[in-house]
UniProtKB/Swiss-Prot annotation:
Job of this protein: ATP-dependent carboxylate-amine ligase which exhibits weak glutamate--cysteine ligase activity.
GO molecular function: ATP binding; glutamate-cysteine ligase activity; ligase activity, forming carbon-nitrogen bonds
Alphabetized UniProt keyword annotations: ATP-binding, Ligase, Nucleotide-binding
Protein name: Putative glutamate--cysteine ligase 2
Gene3D superfamilies noted in UniProt: 3.30.590.20
Species, as recorded: Pseudomonas aeruginosa (strain ATCC 15692 / DSM 22644 / CIP 104116 / JCM 14847 / LMG 12228 / 1C / PRS 101 / PAO1)
Similarity comment text for this entry: Belongs to the glutamate--cysteine ligase type 2 family. YbdK subfamily.
UniProt xrefs under NCBIfam families: gshA_cyan_rel (TIGR02050), PRK13515.1 (NF010039)
EC number: 6.3.2.2
One Pfam family cited in the UniProt record for this chain: GCS2
Length: 377
């Protein structure tokens, strides 16, 4: 498939979050063993970062021009992290929520930045044992990032539906395709961004939040999509972490295509007010994933029709380099990670396994998916 991944004009980056598990029982560890973080920094360099819990880490990519570059980097990074983890008696798991871990066991990272976060958000932060996929797409300085954001925003529930990988919480079926996003909803400034028409309005809003003590720094605005505070990008934050790297690459390509379409549109046509159906579509994606019913252009459509509409809207220039992403997403419509986890769990229970052994087997299968090749040569 690599021959389909032609170069595209929009550069991008991907951040993936991982749980650290005890290799013996596949539950989260309270703390990483001594030397593990240092070994990760030696191996992954500036692309490795600690997270808010000691049982989590992040891999942040360099800047990419093609999905093939992203596949190579993240495929190697996943392999290196997995091998390092095994050297220390751990396993690394990329998924929205751990199927059976108890969030009460997770130990917060004592670093000052994270300590302030737990002080400010209390139990909301303590409960947020989740992993996400973040995608940055570069926005040229000639374009207003908030205007582009408002144009892309109505499509984001579709990307959540395709990424959903968190149907379990604490050993139980949550009833949601993305329980992670339900937990995100407990935080301030982590759901749908306000209808700010341009970056001037955005900067004024941030200044107000800082001056009134609502935030300590600009990075504490965690909307499902936001202008980055440190690089000239739009950052997609709505998606669950993807067990299969190919799924993550597909979502990155779709987001890049939608941003490319927004950049090529007549600026006068950029919407300044949110679609009235956005919140309903967000709920449908969070609850049902690709089985949801979505309100688009005055009618109810399935995720497959909505994906086709999104792709048809994109001009050829926006599609360039992202064709494989769309083709792969069409396959995700058949079964997302959330749907696959539920199907496998149901199969194991029907075969006579008790709840915990079935969930442990599910984690084993997710670990196998984490290391599947992203693209066929």
């Amino acid at each position: 498939m690599t021959h389909d991944l032609a170069a595209s004009g929009l550069r991008f980056g991907i951040e993936e979050e991982f749980f650290l598990l005890d290799a013996s029982d596949l539950d989260i560890v309270r703390s990483a063993p001594a030397g593990f973080v240092a070994a990760c920094r030696d191996t992954l360099g500036e692309h490795f970062a600690e997270e808010m819990f000691e049982c989590q880490v992040e891999v942040a990519s360099p800047v990419f021009s093609t999905l093939a570059e992203a596949a190579r980097f993240h495929g190697q990074a996943r392999q290196r992290l997995a091998h390092l983890a095994m050297d220390f008696g751990l396993r690394s798991l990329c998924v929205g929520t751990h199927p059976f871990a108890d969030w009460r066991r997770a130990r917060s990272n004592p670093a000052a930045h994270f300590a302030r976060l737990f002080e400010d958000q209390g139990r909301v932060a303590r409960r947020s044992l989740v992993c996400g996929l973040h995608v940055h797409v570069e926005i040229p300085p000639s374009h207003d990032r908030m205007a582009v954001l408002q144009r892309v925003l109505p499509w984001l529930p579709l990307l959540l539906a395709l990424s959903a990988s968190s149907p379990f919480r604490g050993g139980r079926r949550s009833g949601l395709a993305s329980y992670r996003r339900a937990l995100c909803g407990e935080w301030p400034r982590m759901n749908i961004p306000p209808a700010l028409p341009d970056e001037d309005a955005y900067r004024r809003h941030l200044a107000l939040l800082r001056e009134t003590g609502c935030i300590r720094e600009d990075g504490q605005v965690w909307w499902m999509i936001r202008p980055s505070s440190h690089v000239p990008t739009l950052e997609l934050r709505i998606c669950d972490a993807c067990p299969r790297l190919a799924d993550a690459l597909s979502l990155a390509g779709l987001f890049r295509a939608l941003v490319g379409e927004a950049l090529g549109a007549d600026p006068r046509a950029l919407p300044v007010a949110r679609d009235a159906c956005l919140e309903e579509n967000y709920w449908q994606a969070l609850r049902y994933g690709c089985a949801g019913r979505y309100l688009v252009e005055g009618r109810c459509v399935g995720a497959g029709d909505w994906l086709e509409m999104a792709w048809r809207q994109c001009r050829p220039q926006a599609r360039q380099g992202n064709e494989w992403a769309y083709q792969h997403a069409c396959g995700l419509l058949e079964e997302t990670s959330a749907a696959r986890q539920l199907r496998r769990y149901r199969r194991l229970r029907e075969a006579g396994q008790e709840r915990h052994p079935a969930l442990r087997r599910l984690v084993e299968e997710l670990l196998e998916e984490n290391l599947q090749p992203a693209l066929a040569g």
